[in-house]
């Protein structure tokens, strides 16, 4: 992660990509219990598909204070990089952030075909391995 290059040499950096949520929380609680300043740096925005609630609950239970700094989602970042707008007057004023069902099922009424029927901007996350399904659902929605 590029942001870690600004960490002081005295900082302990831990790559959590191979850790479970329980292991991450245990590590954070352990360091916080030693009165260390702990930062959990994530890509994107932790409040969007970031397991924020699941992470905060054990920290709250352990008495670890939590502060969340919002990030930039890939939907917003990609629009900025392309110098595009996600909304356009008289075309769409609505943006839906969603994903397709994979390991985690989608709630009733949130199927991609149903969402696409609104003909607004869709930012589709966590679905790169399901592109065939995304394409089929979008085509079926018209």
Set out the residue ranges of the language-model regions.
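Conserved anion/nucleotide-ligand pocket segment
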Residues: 105-142
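Class I S-adenosyl-L-methionine
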Residues: 1-72, 77
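Class I SAM-dependent methyltransferase SAM-binding "motif I" and its flanking Rossmann-like core
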Residues: 43-118
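Residue-level signal for well-ordered alpha-helical positions
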Residues: 6, 81-82, 137
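Structural motif
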Residues: 17-18, 100, 125-129
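Generic beta-sheet signal
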Residues: 36-40, 95, 120-124
């Amino acid at each position: 992660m590029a942001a870690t290059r600004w960490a002081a040499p005295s900082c302990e950096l831990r790559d959590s990509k191979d850790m479970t949520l329980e292991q991450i929380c245990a590590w954070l609680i352990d360091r916080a219990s030693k009165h260390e300043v702990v930062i959990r740096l994530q890509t994107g925005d932790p409040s969007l598909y970031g397991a924020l609630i699941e992470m905060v609950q054990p920290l709250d239970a352990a008495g670890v204070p939590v502060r969340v700094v919002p990030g930039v989602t890939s939907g917003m970042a990609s629009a900025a990089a392309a110098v595009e707008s996600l909304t356009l007057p008289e075309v769409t004023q609505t943006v839906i952030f969603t994903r397709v069902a994979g390991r985690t099922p989608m709630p009733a009424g949130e199927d991609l075909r149903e969402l696409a029927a609104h003909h607004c901007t869709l930012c589709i996350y966590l679905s790169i391995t399901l592109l065939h399904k995304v394409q089929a659902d979008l085509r079926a929605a018209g």
